[in-house]
Amino acid sequence: MPLDWSRVGAGNKDPLLRPREIYAALPNRPWPYLRHEQGEVLERWFERRTDRDVVIKQNTGGGKTVAGLLIARSTLNEGVGKAVYLAPDTYLARQVRAEADRLGLATTGDPDDLAFRSGQAILVTTFHKLINGKSVFGVTGDGRQAIDLGIVVVDDAHAALATAEGQFRLTVAAGHPAYAKLLALFATDLEQQSPKAWADVRAQDFTAVVRIPFWSWQARQSEVMAALHPHAGDDGIKFEWPLIADVLPLCAATVTSRGVELRPPCLPIAMIPAFDKAARRVYLTATLADDSILVTDLDADPKLVQRPVTPGSASDLGDRMILAPVALNRSLDDEAVRVLARQLADGDRDGDGVPDAPPVNVVVLVPSTRAAAAWAPYADRVHHVRDLEAGVAELKAGHVGLVVMVNKYDGVDLPGDACRVLVLDGVPRPMDATERREAAVLSGSPTLLARQIQRIEQGMGRGVRDSEDHCVVLLLGSDLAVATHDQRQRALLSPATRAQVELSRDIADLIQGEGLDSLRSAIGACLDRDPQWVAASRRALAEIRYADSGVVRPEAVTSRQAFDLAATGRQRDAADAMQRATTEVEDPAVRGLLLEQRAAYLNHVDPAAAQRMLTRALELNQFVLRPAAGVVPAQLRAAAVQAKAAAEFLDQEYADGVSLVLGVKALLDEVVWGDEERSDEAEAAWMRLGLHLGVTSTRPEKLYGTGPDNLWALSDERHAVIELKTGCTTGSIAKSDLDQLGGSVRWDVTNYSGVKSLAVMVHPSAVLHGLGTAVEGMRVVTPQKWEALKKAVTAFAVALADGNGRWRDEQAVAEQLAVGKLLAGSFFQTYAEAPKQAA
């Protein structure tokens, strides 16, 4: 007779709660068992499942998506409430749903689906869908009933947070009626804060950034509200306005020629009650070093964030050989690596034009369209975010060749043959106004360096997706080479990535100074799975363990506390909390920035004390807001002995000769002609160039809001007043630029009595515009002169690196300064030329 299956197992109807058991019971599970690391993570989460915030850290490709889906299903089975799985974008959300289908787990993409509302299916959607001012989940004050959630799983949390920050950042675009109103309202304040930056904004220089002083911003809130509120429903404003309107007085307001950007110090995440009040919040992250952003942006419990859930071993990472060609041999320039990448894509391992190995997919990550242009002669495809999904699908389907991806360093899944060679050609630079201003304020600080290393590690993780995967990673450019060579920067990498970098350095040591053939051989060992390389790679990771505790910076915790106090009107308490934050950091640049924020809170209750505090902030960080009373330029004294000053600076900066050469090359590479977006980096590079050569150098325009881009003290009696126009694309020096240079000379003479000024213009042309008049005695550094200077400075570094610490030896430095014609007294006679009248 037929079996009555309804009676089989009828005595046990309780839903399974342990994620491992849920997986084991799936009828169509793709693998018999979960990977060991996944099982460990799921068991440890289950033990802590009642914690409101849980961070799960695994190496890239460690199976976090499957773990997150099983955790969501477990919470549904337990009856805690509805489950939402958040991906950074729609492309990744579709990938997650496909993974769930493969597992046999019920999901939906529709928040109104009854299966989600009744707790039968996991809602898979984007962070943007939940976090926006018109959220279907409800926004505080919108009159709608917020959706109660049992669990929110945030996949690729650090990438998702970029979306969250964007939703709490309101940009009033140039051309919008409110933009002109805001500029008119604060024009006088902006000009007082930085006359040059304000003039640049009005001249449509999109690199110019100037902050509206917080005391002016707070004093005119009624006018600001009158300018913005009528446009609350406009495109570009309506999704952000409801989230920040209540904290508008606390926002930093930053002006560029492209818009006015309003951004709160921390995200008022309580505006999204579905997330803020969710019973459980799980953050899936890679092994990035700093989790402070989970506290500042999402108000996660810092004590819980500091207790991440991890596997027992960090050896679940795929095999990567990470090489920086320029660190192996200075002659291996970027163009040589581009040719090599093309040959690898074609299977031409030995570079003789005839394929001798299987062709592979080579993926190149670049930060901008401009950077992608250099790859155009070699690329089979160039993808931007809008067409990335189709591009990734094509790579997964088979051999494509060399594929360039523009400004996508996270959230891209390139398993197996989809990517066997990954090239990082630069890292994304700050694009929004607040980030650009913060990057300038924190320039050279350990905090900014840690952020850059985090982005580099994110990029390097794209090419391996599980422990059986393998990939060669090539790092282009000196700045990326420094990241893997400099011990301080390597220490900022996660343990597993650091171990792979250390192993790859052993390979690099074997082929140091050799040419492309040796590099090809090393790459082949990884691609061909040479048993000796594979064994060494696995051995390097075998003993690596995840960190027992997560990194949450103390100042991040107190900054969050201060913001929450300020948002409820307790400004004095907020200022007191920020005082604790400033005592918890050693980096003076960050302390200055924190003091600036403390002054902003204090200004609500004691404006005079706020101005005094801002003066203290300026002593720690010369690039914070200048007090309302202004700043008197500091005395500028030339180095008594140029060679001694240079040797002391180089000794402080560089631990070994390779670091010196790479560091100098990275510095020189920051000067890019014809790219306005790189102007600020060029100005910073010129200042650091002076320090490398033993010349006292500053950036008055950044320090005081007026004066030249660079000021070099060639001697106590003579200054070089330097204006940089590297971003110009004109064939002559404009009258306005000449007038600016003349004004900077007058500023120098006024502020430093008895000094003679040498006017210097860094410009793509030495030809004066017909309407312009040269500043008396001026010199012009043209691209040709710059190339000669680069060659001399590079030779200076190479000569000092060739020996046992010669860069620390004053006599050796003096000799090389003389050989390179880099002495302060004659520097601009050699590496600049006189201006020419237009024909």
Place the predicted regions along the sequence by residue:
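Inter-Walker segment of RecA-like/P-loop motor cores
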Residues: R94-Q145, A390-L395
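Catalytic core segments in nucleotide and nucleic-acid processing enzymes
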Residues: T369, R386-A397, L424, A450, ...
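Conserved RecA-like P-loop NTPase helicase motor core
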Residues: L395-V482, C728-T729, V749, P764
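Conserved helix-turn-beta segment of the N-terminal RecA-like "Helicase ATP-binding" lobe
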Residues: T90-A115, V295-L304, P377-H383
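Conserved pre-motif I regulatory segment
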Residues: P2-K57
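Conserved RecA-like ASCE ATPase "motif II neighborhood" in helicase/translocase motors
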Residues: Q120-D156, A160-Q167, R263-P268, V403-D413
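Conserved coupling segment at the C-terminus of the helicase ATP-binding
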Residues: V55, N59, D148-I151, D156-P359, ...
